[in-house]
Amino acid sequence: MTRRYWNINLKEMIEAGVHFGHGIKKWNPKMAPYISAKRKGTHITNLARTTRFLSEACDLVFDAASQGKSFLIVGTKKRAADLVASAAIRARCHYVNKKWFSGMLTNWSITKTRLSQFRDLRAEEKMEKFHHLPKRDVAILKRKLSTLLRYLGGIKYMTRLPDIVIVLDQQKEYIALRECAILGIPTISLADTNCDPDLANISIPANDDTMTSIRLILNKLVFAICEGRSLYIRNH
């Protein structure tokens, strides 16, 4: 794996609140190696460990992107939905930012069928084929299209399982992580002090509740993906 310098700045992480964990009563003992202190009843994440694992994650996604691999970013918190979509679009990644449907990856044949329905309905709407149908049927089809767009819009171009999955909230996206583990898909996950670092291939110790923290980590990963994609384009 290529090791590169990703300009991960300690001051920047402190300003973003990356180091703030959960209350000490909510912690997961498996996170002990990644905690540096307790402050006013709250665990403080060791940012040296954050820097190390974020660098490793950036190296991994850079190498994968430079080989033309595909990525899926998963973050279904309401506050993070727009951030996930904009970051994924910027790096040309697939994304899920509304709801993770159980079996989205493990029952890939069903997901592919839904995506096919979605693409067909979009094509019919653009070709104005709905105009020839009764109003009631048009309303039903438009409602179905709207639902498919809301939940599958971020993976509408996905034709196969992703090569790497990035998860922004381990506890909220537990099912997604389990599906990746079953399928052997490498995962990168933020790991707050109440998380289990063993659930992902690379767990980045970081605050997964504050938008500034999530944005900083995601931006570093997206930058590394974009750099890798640029290298892939130059070589092909």
From Swiss-Prot:
BP term (GO), one: translation
Pfam families, sorted: Ribosomal_S2 (PF00318)
One GO CC term, this protein: plastid
Ribosomal protein keyword on record: yes
GO molecular function, one term: structural constituent of ribosome
SUPFAM superfamilies given in the database record: Ribosomal protein S2
Alphabetical list of CDD domains matching this protein: RPS2
InterPro entries referenced in this protein's UniProt entry, alphabetically: Ribosomal_uS2, Ribosomal_uS2_bac/mit/plastid, Ribosomal_uS2_CS, Ribosomal_uS2_flav_dom_sf
Protein name: Small ribosomal subunit protein uS2c
Classification lineage: Eukaryota, Viridiplantae, Streptophyta, Embryophyta, Tracheophyta
